[in-house]
């Protein structure tokens, strides 16, 4: 992929608003970090996003460029976006992995309840969130 193509992929991040859109919070555990923000799109496509932060810091709403990214997917690509929060800090392993897998299970139930597509699901994340997205894919529950 050439440099121009890569730059063009970033344009939505600069155009989209970084305001927090209206969302519904869905709990999947007892800890306050064990929550998912759901942003309703106008199609049945689904994006599941897991924030980064080196397993030590961060939050599903803390990264400004991530808010722009999600807003773009909700407002312009019409995705339904689920943003996963998980336990972080000194005792994050194995809690972060377990939390994200539990959150994914909860999201699958939400997808069914909201009659969204099980065929159009993207699971992604930044940094530690990318690792956790990969762990969902490698989970025995989803092979």
Question: What do these predicted regions represent?
Answer:
Residues 102-143:
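Primarily recognizes the serine-hydrolase "nucleophile elbow" in alpha/beta-hydrolase
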Residues 53, 85-89:
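Short beta-to-alpha linker loops that shape the active-site pocket of alpha/beta-hydrolase fold enzymes
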Residues 54-57, 61-62, 81, 106:
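Serine-hydrolase catalytic-loop signature spanning alpha/beta hydrolases and amidase-signature enzymes
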Residues 61-82:
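Short amphipathic alpha-helix adjacent to the substrate-entry channel of hydrolases
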Residues 44-54:
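Short beta-strand element of the alpha/beta-hydrolase
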Residues 2-10:
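Sec-dependent signal peptide recognition
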Residues 43-45, 77-79, 118-120:
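Loop/turn elements at helix/coil->beta-strand transitions in domains of secreted/extracellular proteins
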Residues 14-42:
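N-terminal cap/lid segment of alpha/beta-hydrolase-fold proteins
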């Amino acid at each position: 992929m050439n440099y121009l193509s890569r730059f063009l992929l970033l344009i939505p991040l600069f155009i989209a608003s970084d305001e927090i859109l209206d969302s519904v919070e869905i709990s999947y555990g007892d800890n306050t970090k064990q929550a998912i923000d759901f942003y309703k799109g106008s199609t049945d496509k689904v994006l599941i996003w897991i924030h980064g932060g080196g397993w030590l810091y961060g939050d599903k709403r803390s990264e400004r460029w991530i808010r722009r990214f999600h807003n773009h997917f909700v407002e312009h690509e019409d995705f339904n976006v689920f943003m996963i929060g998980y336990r972080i800090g000194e005792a994050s392993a194995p809690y972060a992995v377990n939390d994200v897998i539990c959150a994914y299970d909860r999201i699958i139930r939400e997808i069914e309840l909201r009659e969204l597509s099980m065929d159009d699901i993207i699971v992604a994340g930044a940094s530690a969130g990318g690792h956790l997205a990969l762990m969902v894919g490698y989970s025995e529950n989803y092979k």
